């Protein structure tokens, strides 16, 4: 019997790489995306297209009502998206309070209902400085909670937790992945801005891999 897994899939290059890894490992993959009111909801269109291309089961769940409780992030509220690299202090405005705990909790519940025993998500070392819910200690504690929250044991797996976006892209290029199927920019315009932290980190990853980013930029 093929083992089922859930992959939290934003439509970005990190989770796209993780999704493809799970597919190549032979799992029955169930991709799960969330509309949490992000201004870059365009990524969900990319997520849908990628899953159709891969032939992966995919659900997009609308939880945008949570913004009545957890506003204030530049990703969900009427606040300017900061420009510059992730390491800069201004990027903390892109933190959505408790986002990954909420998304992972829902994904674990979905996994239990599917009789899946793993939930994958694409946290990596480049997120550690800015996003507390992408750090190793967070993943460790979430797994502790998962071990006691249900009768069924579900493990949260983050394959690139100690690696950078550069490493993620290296792995993806080695798998022959098409990153034209992904969206990274925090601004939801027709073309990627090339200036926000997400774009800067993506462009750096392609540069360090001596590869051409297929995404169009302003």
Curated annotation (Swiss-Prot):
Q: How is the cofactor bound?
A: Binds 1 zinc ion per subunit.
Pathway it belongs to? Answer: Purine metabolism; 7-cyano-7-deazaguanine biosynthesis
Keyword Metal-binding in the entry? The reply is yes
Q: Which SUPFAM superfamilies match?
A: Adenine nucleotide alpha hydrolases-like
Annotated transmembrane regions? none
Q: Which residues form a coiled coil?
A: none
The UniProt record gives the binding positions of ATP as 9-19
Q: What is this protein called?
A: 7-cyano-7-deazaguanine synthase
Organism taxonomic ancestry: Bacteria, Pseudomonadati, Pseudomonadota, Gammaproteobacteria, Alteromonadales
């Amino acid at each position: 019997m093929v083992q089922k897994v859930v992959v939290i899939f934003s439509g970005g290059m990190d989770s796209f790489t993780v999704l493809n890894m799970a597919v190549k490992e032979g799992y029955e993959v169930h991709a799960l995306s969330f509309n949490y009111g992000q201004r870059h909801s365009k990524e969900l269109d990319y997520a849908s297209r990628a899953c159709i291309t891969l032939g992966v089961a995919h659900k997009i769940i609308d939880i945008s009502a949570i913004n009545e409780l957890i506003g204030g992030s530049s990703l969900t509220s009427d606040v300017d998206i900061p420009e510059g690299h992730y390491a800069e202090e201004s990027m903390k405005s892109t933190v959505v309070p408790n986002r990954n705990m909420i998304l992972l909790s829902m994904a674990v519940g979905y996994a239990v209902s599917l009789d899946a025993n793993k939930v994958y998500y694409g946290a990596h070392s480049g997120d550690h400085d800015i996003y507390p819910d992408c750090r190793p200690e967070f993943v460790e504690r979430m797994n502790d909670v998962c071990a006691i929250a249900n009768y069924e044991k579900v493990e949260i797996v983050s394959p690139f937790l100690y690696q950078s976006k550069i490493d993620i892209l290296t792995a993806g290029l080695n798998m022959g992945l098409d990153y034209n199927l992904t969206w990274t920019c925090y601004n939801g315009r027709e073309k990627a801005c090339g200036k926000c932290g997400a774009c800067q980190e993506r462009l750096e990853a392609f540069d360090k891999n001596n590869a051409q980013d297929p995404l169009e930029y302003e």
